[in-house]
């Protein structure tokens, strides 16, 4: 295992695979804040050269956190399909990149070997790819999951309807839900981030969602994105629930900062399979985002792309229905501007797909970041080309509760029309039956939620 190279007369030596991974990363303010990123473009290129020559066995044998010290590492390593791994262990990272991008390599081929990849391998190959490489490679990979409906089918583009409200007012939430449905949003999930994180409030909102879903016979899923334990208590108290949500991290310490461990998630999954209202078998919803581990001092010297890949390795253990990165949510301290947000969104989507999970993206930014709505629309268009499973839908793209900017209801509808994609089939049929969509386009009824009042 060689950790040095010479470029144009200068020799670059790296102390560990963890350092190589960090310095091979594209520029991110989060890595610079942590003191991990390359100091110069030349050092970044040198790290990429060294990384390209490492074997997949090198990466498996040197996880960024030791097996004995981190639960996430143990899950990733123990879940590995040894037969798939043995078939590729001698490949270099460069070999893996060339194979994924080869015209002769199919999505089915990639899915077959993906169970033999650790998260460090996934992150490593991502770092050697251009933005177009990430789009091209991700578009090959189809990952589906089933809750009440099936997400990720070829030819579909889904949307989470996110009716957040500053006071959790049921009527305000309902107004956003009905408007979003009329625009074709909500086939991925109708999911609210509550202001009040209590089992009582979770149950109250879930019952309202269930009332709307049952009255109009809407083929979708419902979820309230409170802490996992609050949702579990609400379900035990009798609340209807299709999906249990939790934000996750790429290290045991990061998950502890979020207030849970793997046993908590396993318990939540079992609870919903036995007491939830969904068909299943995929009944979990996870959100991630580059930089979350650094924000809780849980990165242990690893870069944010590698940490993000480890989130996906952790997630796939629990067979989720939805996973999405909230790509610009933490702010410019981690992703400085539109260029970094765009890169991170493409990286996260590719790494999620390569890890074998049904991947979506919250294309978003904070108000103090050097990005605007045009940048987010650009990212959504690129991710649609990459085969992203779903986006967010918030009234006018302005989340007045979480105080950040993301995609609105119209963006997903426009991208569906541009690319010839539809909502999930059962939901698309419902939209047509209700008169909101005709011949693949929104009708004049779109945007008028009053037609769904009852």
Regions found by a protein language model. Name each.
Residues 84, 157-172, 294-304, 365-374:
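Active-site mouth loops of central-metabolism enzymes
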Residues 113-118, 122-130, 189-207, 325-339, ...:
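Glycine-rich, proline-tolerant flexible connector loops at the mouths of alpha/beta enzymes
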Residues 64-72, 141-165, 283-296, 359-361:
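N-terminal small/glycine-rich loop or linker at the start of catalytic domains
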Residues 133-141, 145-146, 153-159, 199-227, ...:
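Alpha-helix-loop-beta-strand connector modules within alpha/beta enzyme cores
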Residues 236-298:
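Phosphate/diphosphate-binding glycine-rich loops and adjacent basic-rich segments that engage nucleotide
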Residues 1-142:
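Long, compositionally biased, glycine/small-hydrophobic-enriched stretches that function as flexible linkers
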Residues 155-164, 188-190, 218-226, 243-246, ...:
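Hydrophobic faces of well-ordered beta-strands that scaffold small-molecule active sites
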Residues 180, 383:
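Conserved, mostly hydrophobic/aromatic
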């Amino acid at each position: 295992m060689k950790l040095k190279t010479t470029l144009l007369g200068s020799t670059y030596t790296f102390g560990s695979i963890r350092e190589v991974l960090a310095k091979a990363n594209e520029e991110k303010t989060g890595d610079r804040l942590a003191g991990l990123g390359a100091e110069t473009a030349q050092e970044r290129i040198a790290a990429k050269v060294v990384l390209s020559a490492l074997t997949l066995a090198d990466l498996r044998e040197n996880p960024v956190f030791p097996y004995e010290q981190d639960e996430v590492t143990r899950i990733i390593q123990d879940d590995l399909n040894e037969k798939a791994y043995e078939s590729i262990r001698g490949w270099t990272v460069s070999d893996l990149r060339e194979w994924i991008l080869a015209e002769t390599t199919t999505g089915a081929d990639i899915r077959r070997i993906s169970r033999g990849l650790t998260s460090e391998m996934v992150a490593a190959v991502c770092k050697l790819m251009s933005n177009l490489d990430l789009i091209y490679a991700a578009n090959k990979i189809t990952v589906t999951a089933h809750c009440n409906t099936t997400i990720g089918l070829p030819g579909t583009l889904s949307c989470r309807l996110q009716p957040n409200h500053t006071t959790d007012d049921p009527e305000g939430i309902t107004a956003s839900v009905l408007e979003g449905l009329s625009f074709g949003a909500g086939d991925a999930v109708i999911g609210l981030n509550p202001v009040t994180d209590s089992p009582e409030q979770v149950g109250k909102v879930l019952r309202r969602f269930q009332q709307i879903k049952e009255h109009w016979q809407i083929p979708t899923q419902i979820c309230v994105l409170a802490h996992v334990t609050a949702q579990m208590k609400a379900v035990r108290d009798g609340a209807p629930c299709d999906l249990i949500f939790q934000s996750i991290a790429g290290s045991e310490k990061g998950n502890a900062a979020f207030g849970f461990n793997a046993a908590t998630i396993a318990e939540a999954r079992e609870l919903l399979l036995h007491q939830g209202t969904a068909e299943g078998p995929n009944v979990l919803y996870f959100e991630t985002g580059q930089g979350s581990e650094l924000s809780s001092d849980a990165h242990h010297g690893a870069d944010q792309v590698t940490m993000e890949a480890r989130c996906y390795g952790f997630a796939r253990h629990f067979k989720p229905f939805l996973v999405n990165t909230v790509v610009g949510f933490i702010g410019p301290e981690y992703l400085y501007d539109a260029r970094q947000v765009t890169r991170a969104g493409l990286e996260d989507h590719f790494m999620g797909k390569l890890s074998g999970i049904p991947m979506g993206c919250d294309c978003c930014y904070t108000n103090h970041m050097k990005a605007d709505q045009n940048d987010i629309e650009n990212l959504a268009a690129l991710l649609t080309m990459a085969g992203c499973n779903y986006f967010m839908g918030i009234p006018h793209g302005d989340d007045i509760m979480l105080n950040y900017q993301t995609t609105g209801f119209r963006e997903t509808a426009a991208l569906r029309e541009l690319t010839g994609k539809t909502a999930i089939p059962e939901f698309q049929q419902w939209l047509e039956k209700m008169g909101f969509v005709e011949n693949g386009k929104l009708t004049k009824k779109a945007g008028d939620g009053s037609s769904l009042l009852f």
